[in-house]
Amino acid sequence: MKLTCVLIVIMLFLTVCPLITADHSRDKQEHPAMRLKDRIRYLRRGKLTRDCKHQNDSCAEEGEECCSDLRCMTSGAGAICVT
């Protein structure tokens, strides 16, 4: 009887544990993993580059660069990428 109760408690714990510890970011991965083979292929094609900011996008934070034909212009409200 005691063994049965212990087994039931363990089974309940094991079924509830993943629900308690689960992260609520389901299907919201920001940077999906890229296989090494794909990464090498993109590097050879020159497509593995940092994203640049387009016209009228904010460029105030460090590390954010405007695309090659744009420049970051600071105004009273912040900074945006302009031609």
Swiss-Prot record:
Propeptide segment residues: 23-49
Name the UniProt record assigns to this protein: Conotoxin MiEr92
UniProt entry keywords in alphabetical sequence: Disulfide bond, Knottin, Neurotoxin, Secreted, Signal, Toxin
Family to which this protein belongs: Belongs to the conotoxin O1 superfamily.
Organism, scientific name: Conus miles (Soldier cone)
Tissues where this protein is expressed: Expressed by the venom duct.
Signal peptide stretch: 1-22
Comment field on protein domains: The presence of a 'disulfide through disulfide knot' structurally defines this protein as a knottin. The cysteine framework is VI/VII (C-C-CC-C-C).
GO annotations of cellular component type: extracellular region
Cysteines paired by S-S bonds: 52-67, 59-72, 66-81
Domain of life: Eukaryota
Principal cellular location given in the protein's record: secreted
Cellular localization per UniProt: Secreted
GO MF entries: ion channel inhibitor activity; toxin activity
